[in-house]
Amino acid sequence: MENNRIVDFSKTSLHDIYGENCFNDAIMRELLPKAVYKELKEVQQGNKELTLETANAVASAMKTWAVSKGATHFTHWFQPLNDLTAEKHDSFIAPTEDGKVILEFSGKELIKGESDASSFPSGGLRATFEARGYTAWDTTSPAFLMADNTGVTLNIPTAFWSSSVQSPNTYHRCLNTFRHSGER
């Protein structure tokens, strides 16, 4: 994945590159074992709970795909009520005792992010000491890669949940609106 790549559309078709940095359905179908792909589709449709085994398989495939495109970090990406995006970056890279590195990314890391949300922007909705919360992976939104001058990051769409059961993000409120509109 190149940063700020300029595409010459006289030589490249938009159809060939559209979605190439998105961990979309076609990529999942290609990289996930058939049973895992099928179970994830059931989870996305609301027919099944996500198991840690499935999350681990998805995380492994997602990491392999992202690293093959130059990613070294991942972030749980969400939209707080300040109309910006918020994210907490973590690395796939873990040092070993012998001074080398290994690449790690587990289903637990995919499913749920930081439990201390004091580093997340609040838009003035709460004091820092009240910042208990976490991000939860939205299985229905595809992860995607973002590149800038510091490198490539895997962005995992999530919803933020505060421990006080308030939802300080627009995304969760939109999901609630859609869910409740179907109940009328």
Briefly describe each language-model feature range:
Residues 2-107, 111-132, 139:
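Histidine/acidic residue-rich metal-binding segments in metalloenzymes
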Residues 109-173, 177-180, 184:
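Flexible C-terminal active-site loop/helix
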